[in-house]
Design a protein with these regions (language model features):
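Short, intrinsically disordered, charge-balanced linker/junction segments flanking boundaries
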Residues: 164-167
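Non-transmembrane, solvent-exposed regions of membrane trafficking/translocation machinery
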Residues: 1-150, 154-155, 159
């Protein structure tokens, strides 16, 4: 029966029973889970034997809101984030932000406009220059708000971040 097959799969592949891997295989989203299963996924990912299989510089973080494609608001995205700093911290943190404002972009979508100090502007320019064509995750309080692809170097210390913000 179908339920017996599901129970067998849960025994043999417990993580796969609660986390659906991203079928595209590209981008920073590695999987999807129903919100009721995210704690279970976190438990599996925290297991020593699972952690040992993952790269040391990999951080797995949930999106802050349900996936855009899910109108019921139940499915959350799990992002794979490469930690580029030796200390495991983000290459840029809030200490370089001099101003951040809630605004609306040219498409009338909520966004955050931010300005950085000189050090932050320099580091942001290097970070964006070195990651053209790749995604840079915007993580606040441990959740991914946005993971846009970088189109080019961003200089001048001013950026606008769009993503899962609510007005």
């Amino acid at each position: 029966s179908n339920s017996a097959a599901m129970e067998q799969m849960k025994k043999e592949h417990p993580l796969a029973s609660v986390l659906q891997l991203n079928p595209n295989g590209y981008g920073s989203v590695v999987g999807y889970a129903d919100y009721k299963d995210t704690a279970q996924v976190n438990q599996y990912l925290a297991m020593k034997e699972v952690k040992e299989m993952l790269p040391k510089d990999l951080r797995l973080k949930w999106g802050v809101k349900a996936a855009d494609f899910d109108k019921q608001g139940r499915i959350f995205e799990l992002y794979a984030i490469k930690s580029t700093e030796r200390n495991g911290r983000a290459p840029l943190e809030g200490d370089v932000i001099t101003d951040a404002k809630d605004e609306y972009d040219q498409f009338n979508k909520p966004c955050v406009s931010m300005s950085m100090n000189t050090d932050g502007a320099r580091r942001w320019a290097v970070l964006t220059k070195n990651n053209v064509g790749k995604a840079i995750a915007i993580v606040l309080d441990g959740y991914v708000y946005s993971a846009p692809n970088v189109n080019g170097e961003i200089t001048g210390g001013h950026s606008q971040i769009t993503g899962n913000f609510t007005p």
